[in-house]
């Protein structure tokens, strides 16, 4: 049995439970988005640079997805192809923008875009989509950003706890 793997499993398991408790108490933390960010923290290296990259690139992706909903709702540039055209434009901008060092992890930026789009599209009756353009904590992009930050921090904490447990 690998001692480090056991320690990480224990750490992530316990903190995962705490993460769910937090999500039930603070409704703007979306636990599944937090877990995506948590996993990306480790995929990006599991260190302070990964924490920074996970947060900045993930939120960048969330903002671009929010921009998709705002633009596609306000400006119809393609009739029945309006949505696909705006997806093409915003995803192009998303990937092109990963040349900027703080957004340079394209997979994390894409995940930020995807969780935002998924959250908005799959909300009951599309209830989140009209809220995209609001300046409030109820804006789905804000909730996703909060969740990315919290999930990334849980990733960092679980790594530190695992290291402390395994010695």
What does each of the following model-derived ranges do?
Residues 1-3, 13, 75-76:
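Charged, low-complexity, helix/coiled-coil-prone segments
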Residues 1-3, 163-167:
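Short, charged juxtamembrane terminal tails flanking transmembrane helices
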Residues 4-5, 15-49:
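Long, hydrophobic N-terminal alpha-helical segment
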Residues 6, 10-18, 22, 51-67, ...:
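Hydrophobic, lipid-facing residues on alpha-helical transmembrane segments of integral membrane proteins
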Residues 20-34, 72-88:
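Structural signature of hydrophobic alpha-helical transmembrane segments
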Residues 28-45, 90-92, 99-132:
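Pore- and pathway-forming membrane helices of multi-pass small-molecule/ion transporters and channels
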Residues 47-55, 77-78, 103:
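Interfacial helix-loop-helix linkers and transmembrane-helix boundary segments
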Residues 74-77, 124-138:
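Membrane-interface helix termini and inter-helical loops of multi-pass transporters
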């Amino acid at each position: 049995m690998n001692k480090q793997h056991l320690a990480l499993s224990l750490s992530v398991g316990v903190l995962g439970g705490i993460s769910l408790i937090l999500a039930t108490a603070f409704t703007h933390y979306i636990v599944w988005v937090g877990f995506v960010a948590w996993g990306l923290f480790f995929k990006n290296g599991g260190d302070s640079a990964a924490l920074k990259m996970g947060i900045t690139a993930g939120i960048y992706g969330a903002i671009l997805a929010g921009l998709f909903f705002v633009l596609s709702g306000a400006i119809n540039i393609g009739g029945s192809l309006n949505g696909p055209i705006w997806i093409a434009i915003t995803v192009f901008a998303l990937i092109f923008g990963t040349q900027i060092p703080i957004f340079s992890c394209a997979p994390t930026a894409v995940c930020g875009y995807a969780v935002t789009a998924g959250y908005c599209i799959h909300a009951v009756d599309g209830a989140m989509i009209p809220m995209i353009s609001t300046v409030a904590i109820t804006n789905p992009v804000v909730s996703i950003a909060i969740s990315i930050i919290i999930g990334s921090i849980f990733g960092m904490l679980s790594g530190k706890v695992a290291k402390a447990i395994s010695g």
